[in-house]
Structures are given as structure tokens and as C-alpha cells.
Amino acid sequence: MWLPFGLLLMATRIVIGLTFPRWLSIPILQATGIRYTIKGLPNRINEDTEKRSKGMLYACNHRTLLDPLFLSFSLNKPLTAVTYSLSRVSEMLSPIPTVRLTRDRDLDGRIMESMLGQGDLVVCPEGTTCRERFLLRFSPLFAEMSDRITPVALNSHVGMFYGTTAGGLKCLDPVYFFLNPCPVYSACLLGTVRGMGTCRDVEGLKFEVANHVQRMIGESLGFRCTSLTRRDKYMVLAGNEGIV
């Protein structure tokens, strides 16, 4: 009985998110039943960011394709998202700027460096969505991009419709999420971690930083940290390497 109304509600929420300015869309979306919470010190982080020539780098776990969007809404500030394997549909419909990474380490490093010079950046080092109660291995590239990294623990809660874990279209994540009557997103800012923006030649340190950020997020969410890669995930669940 919910599905017909849910489809109408989902379409309404997506149209609002895509067409209304952020300051107006946030209260309207909340009125439709969407809830989001944020813990941490966003005001202090905003002030620190304004004093630096480089934007803040937010590193978060990857629950759904909506992660960067809800972080932007929670902080009430513009963010640019860098992501792997983003479909053209998701890229075109995203209400925040998105930049596609190539899995070429040197090229991706230059892309992220350029984006940080223009403003705040959010990256999901797992490289793919993971909806279970564990974290995939964090790629260490983000640890080399900035001296100051803000780990963010993200989680989503829905009651009826869930996004796919392995196969299927990831661009349908927003559809499944917004079909739910009262979906919830939570974000927890976990302070600031020292990155390697000025000391990239220290071999091995980037892995320590990446693992430390993973542990911080895992402890905050109560998730288990693993060394599984995105390739491991797709080989086990779908029998392929998950290349889009």
C-alpha cells in the first residue's frame, strides 16, 4: 500500500533536492520526513578552513551514493565530491560538484590537489559502497593530499527499501533511500588528523594515516575494520571486479 505514495514522495524529494537552493531545500526535505543528524564541531572547522589557502579534506566511509550530499547538507556548506565509478546519470543529477577519479594514482593525486585549491573536498577512501557493518581498506592517496584531514563517520537508516550491495545500478541509491517514509542519515565529525601534505616522501606513513582514519571511523560506528579491497568485495559477492 505504501509504494504508490512512496513513489510520489520519492519524486518530490528528488525534484526539491535538485532544483531548490540548499538553504531552502533542507527544511522542506525535513518536512517530508527525512532526518539527518550531525555531531562534531562544524563551526570551528569552518573558521579554520577560512584561514587556510587550501580547503578542508573530509574522509568518510561510503554507505550510499548520497554520502557527500548529506555531508554537504549537514554542514550547510558547498563541498566537491571525488569518487570512483560514478555513473553519468548520477554525475549529471548531483546537486553538488562531482569529480570522477581514474584509478591512476598520479593523475588522481593531481586532480585532488587541484580541487583542494578551489575549496573543501570530500572523498570516500573505500572506493565503493559498503552497506554491511564493516569497513573496506582505505586507499592511502587521500592521506598525501592535505596536512589536515577530518574523518567523518556516516551511517544511514531505512525501514523498507535498501540499495543493492553488489550487483545492480548504484545510481538507484537515491531512489531506494527516498522511497522510505522516514529515512535517517547521521554524520559524526571526528576531529582533525594530521595528513602528509608536506611530507609525502616518508614511505609507509601514508598507510598509517589511512589506517588510523579507518580505525577512528570504525570505532565511532561500531564497525569492524578490514583489509578487504573493493575488488575483494565484488569478486566474493558478484564474481567480477566491479568496474563500471
Question: What are these language model-derived features?
Answer:
Residues 1, 93-113, 117, 146, ...:
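N-terminal hydrophobic signal-anchor/signal peptide
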Residues 14-42, 46-106, 159-160:
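Catalytic core of membrane glycerolipid acyltransferases/transacylases, capturing the structured
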Residues 89-92, 119, 131-207, 224-240:
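A cross-family acyltransferase "interaction/gating" segment
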